[in-house]
């Protein structure tokens, strides 16, 4: 998933806030299981939607004619004034979605059914290599004379509101990308009761869609994955070609752009092309860790050699819904590794802390256009949130699944699941099994009770709400039990806060704060705020949601990498300098201060100057003793502003790696 937020800043760099809960760019993981490989003969596919913590997701129902014929929808995610727009040629179809709660940044409807039996799951973010982008760049607003191309923020809304089946959806996207361009690279899935298509959008105008075979499975985190394809010319449409076997729909210049970029792996004369080799960017370690663990989830004997992974995989295992649920929770156990959510390196798991929701579609053998299947949805992290069956024609979800609050709220499935996860992270070994055991027991029962045949809208709504309420009660039980054990844990045990930074705070990666037992009644994180002046800034202790911690009972031990700051460095609690020493290439100091200013410089008087500059911080600290509530601050906007300055034009937020 990608998200783009454009902001007018002025001197907003001074407001930059980057916390230890850094945003994850490029982190979604998709999966497709062909019907020949499943235990019940169904087709299964879905995705984890990953970006960041404290980002609410809700289930929605959009009624027929929400958008009238002749009415336009506009994408504001990249440029509010010059974004992609689509004008409906007919009133929009009724559709469901799993949506963001900040429409001012874009629709991001992500996944859903429509009344015609179409299913859309969009998108897994990816990016092409620099060579092909130099030939056919993304239509991302860099050229201000052209409207921005289509993005993840609006594509699902346009497709579900407009298209009747999977083939038509692919053709619609092909036409839009060919004529209006794409602002970003993406992988996506559209399906109906008869067929499933997987599509990759590579550059500003190049794409390939493949009708998915029934005897394969695929795992696709953030990259392009289609390997060698035979793109023959069967039928030539105005904006795309259809292969002679009907298996591919592709852009007319798919060979030419790669050839002009000198990246073509293949032969245009024989119509063979290795799309991964020709168009994909470098494979990231965090992508490799997820594709390897994901493949082994369904093919335990899989082995890997090099960085090329066949998109179409075989297995002798008969795969179940439970297996796919487990896939969304995979934390590299099958690779005998311990996952690391923060570094986003080779230990980054599918089941990471940045998952905002996960959805799995189950298309049974009995599927029809009127009743194409079931969506299993876990709002919040599936590590703590049970999957619940949602039906194509239901009219509403439970209020807790539709609660659009952007602050912590116990009457929200998303927020309750994430609050539970935050506590688990302090003692995963002991606390995660509590959630896992209860969730597995519930889901096993729910899978048995799910209905895969036609129901009335009233019946479907009632069944979903009954199951969703039961899942919510289970989540509340998990939250209550873990909260009690968590509070006992931080009261009776020391723990260490580990900081992992990004961009401006990347040099601070490896910073730690050692917290003695019973130091505070809340779990704490380290937040770093670089100031506009180079080499200065603040260290702040915050709770799960970025709210400042007002005091601690014990002295904490801070350890800051010396490589993060150059020259003479001083740390201050208000006006008072904190004595520090260098140990193992870290500045180490002890203090009860929860807000610390730092100043790096070579001048002898730098420490004195910093003390004067920090007097304002003392005043603020005195005034800031109000009780901290569980509330999401405006840190998302501040981060967006800071990264906008760094990028000079805009900040691009991308889902799950």
Task: Give the role of each language-model region.
Residues 1, 13, 502-509, 513-516, ...:
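Intrinsically disordered, low-complexity repeat and linker tracts
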Residues 15-25:
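C-terminal segment of classical bacterial N-terminal signal peptides
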Residues 28-151, 172-301, 306-309, 314:
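A contiguous strand-loop segment
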Residues 337-460:
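Substrate-recognition/cap regions that form aromatic- and gly/pro-loop-enriched pockets
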Residues 502-508, 512, 521, 549-550, ...:
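Proteolytic cleavage junctions
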């Amino acid at each position: 998933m990608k998200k783009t937020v454009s902001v007018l800043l002025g001197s907003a760099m001074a407001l930059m806030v980057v916390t230890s809960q850094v945003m994850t760019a490029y982190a979604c993981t998709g999966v497709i299981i062909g019907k020949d490989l499943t235990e019940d003969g169904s087709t299964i596919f879905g995705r984890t939607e990953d970006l960041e913590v404290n980002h609410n997701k809700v289930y929605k129902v959009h009624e027929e004619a929400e958008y009238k014929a002749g009415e336009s929808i506009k994408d504001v995610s990249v440029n509010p004034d010059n974004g992609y727009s689509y004008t409906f040629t007919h009133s929009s179809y009724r559709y469901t979605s799993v949506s963001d709660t900040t429409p001012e940044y874009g629709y991001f409807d992500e996944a859903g059914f429509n009344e015609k039996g179409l299913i859309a799951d969009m998108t897994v973010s990816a990016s092409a290599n620099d060579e092909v982008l130099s030939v056919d760049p993304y239509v991302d607003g860099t050229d201000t004379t052209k409207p921005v191309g289509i993005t993840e923020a609006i594509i699902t809304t346009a497709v579900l509101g407009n298209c009747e089946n999977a083939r038509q959806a692919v053709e619609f996207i092909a036409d839009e990308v060919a004529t209006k361009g794409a602002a970003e690279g993406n992988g996506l899935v559209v399906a109906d009761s008869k067929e499933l298509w997987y599509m990759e959008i590579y550059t500003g105008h190049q794409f390939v869609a493949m009708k998915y075979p029934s005897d394969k499975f695929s795992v696709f985190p953030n990259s392009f994955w289609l390997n060698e394809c035979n793109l023959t010319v069967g039928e030539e449409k105005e904006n795309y070609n259809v292969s002679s076997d009907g298996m591919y729909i592709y852009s007319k210049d798919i060979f030419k752009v790669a050839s002009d970029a000198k990246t073509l792996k293949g032969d245009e004369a024989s119509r063979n092309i290795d799309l991964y080799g020709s168009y994909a960017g470098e494979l990231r370690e965090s992508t490799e860790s997820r594709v390897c663990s994901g493949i082994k989830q369904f093919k335990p004997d899989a082995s890997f050699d090099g960085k090329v992974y066949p998109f179409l995989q075989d297995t002798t295992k008969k795969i179940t819904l439970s297996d796919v649920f487990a896939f969304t929770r995979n934390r590299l156990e099958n690779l005998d590794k311990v996952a690391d959510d923060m570094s986003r390196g080779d230990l980054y798991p599918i089941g990471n802390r940045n998952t905002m929701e996960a959805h799995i579609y189950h298309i049974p053998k009995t599927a029809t256009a009127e009743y194409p299947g079931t969506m299993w949805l876990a709002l919040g992290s599936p590590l703590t949130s049970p999957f619940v069956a949602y039906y194509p024609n239901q009219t509403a979800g439970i209020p807790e699944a539709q609660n659009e609050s952007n602050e912590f709220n116990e009457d929200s499935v998303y927020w309750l699941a994430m609050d539970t996860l935050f506590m688990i992270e302090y003692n995963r070994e002991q606390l995660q099994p509590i959630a896992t055991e209860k969730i597995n027991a519930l889901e096993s029962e729910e899978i048995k009770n799910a209905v895969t045949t036609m129901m009335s809208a009233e019946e479907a709504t009632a069944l979903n709400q009954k199951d969703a309420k039961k899942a919510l009660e289970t989540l509340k039980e998990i939250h209550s039990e873990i909260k009690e054990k968590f509070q006992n844990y931080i009261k009776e045990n020391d723990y260490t806060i580990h900081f992992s930074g990004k961009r401006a705070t990347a040099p601070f990666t490896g910073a730690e704060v050692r917290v003695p037992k019973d130091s505070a009644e809340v779990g704490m994180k380290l937040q770093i705020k670089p100031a506009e002046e180079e080499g200065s800034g603040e260290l702040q202790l915050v709770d799960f949601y970025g709210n400042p911690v007002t005091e601690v009972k014990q002295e904490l031990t801070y350890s800051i990498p010396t490589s993060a700051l150059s020259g003479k460095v001083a740390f201050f609690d208000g006006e008072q300098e904190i004595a520090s020493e260098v140990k193992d290439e870290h500045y180490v100091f002890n203090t009860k201060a929860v807000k610390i200013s730092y100043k790096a410089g070579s001048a002898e008087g730098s420490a004195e100057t910093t003390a004067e500059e920090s007097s304002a911080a003392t005043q603020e600290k005195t005034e800031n003793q109000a009780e901290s509530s569980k509330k999401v601050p405006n840190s998302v906007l501040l981060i967006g502003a800071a990264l906008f300055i760094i990028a000079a034009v805009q900040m691009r937020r991308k889902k799950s790696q």
